[in-house]
UniProtKB/Swiss-Prot annotation:
Localization per Swiss-Prot or TrEMBL: Cell membrane
Principal location listed in the UniProt entry: membrane
Topological relation to the membrane, as annotated: Single-pass membrane protein
Family designation: Belongs to the ATPase B chain family.
Organism: Clostridium botulinum (strain Langeland / NCTC 10281 / Type F)
Name of the protein: ATP synthase subunit b
Family annotation (PANTHER family): ATP SYNTHASE SUBUNIT B, ATP SYNTHASE SUBUNIT B', CHLOROPLASTIC
Length: 159
């Protein structure tokens, strides 16, 4: 294959003519398409950067809100726990007070029953004393018999 100088010059001239024709008819259109595409890419990159910044801001905001919600949740739980403990303490206190009232009432009732029993015993003792006196008056007794009756009376009364 032989390449001659006129062929090289003809090829260069053809290339230059082709370049001029392409430049004249299509270069502006191609440049416009490339520029349009370039501006679209730049806009998309800028939009992506803006969206990324916005997403980071929203993420930080959401994390802050989540943290606040957790803190509020802890506060609410602690508040209700405190209220529950107070209610528990009130219930226990009321139960102790009720138990103390019942114990006091039971003691008073026992004391009243004891007094009633003592009064009944005294009444019986008086009746026995009257009975002994009447028996004593019915018969004349000597000193030994009198002592035996008193001991008998005391043993019956339980004094």
């Amino acid at each position: 294959m032989n390449i001659s100088i006129p062929q090289i010059i003809a090829a260069i001239l053809n290339f230059i003519i082709l370049l001029l024709i392409v430049k004249h008819f299509w270069f502006d259109k191609i440049t416009a398409v490339v520029d349009s595409r370039q501006s679209e890419i730049i806009n998309k990159i800028e939009d992506t950067d803006k969206n990324q910044k916005l997403a980071l801001e929203l993420k930080e905001k959401n994390e802050l809100e989540l943290s606040n919600a957790k803190n509020q949740g802890k506060t609410i739980v602690e508040e209700y726990k405190s209220k529950a403990e107070n209610v528990y303490e009130d219930i226990v206190k009321e139960a102790h007070e009720e138990a103390d009232r019942i114990i006091k009432k039971s003691r008073l009732e026992a004391e009243r029953q004891k007094k009633n029993a003592e009064e009944e015993i005294r009444a019986e003792a008086v009746e026995l004393a009257v009975l002994v006196s009447s028996k004593t008056l019915e018969k004349t007794i000597d000193d030994l018999e009198h002592r035996r009756l008193i001991k008998d009376f005391i043993s019956k009364v339980g004094i």
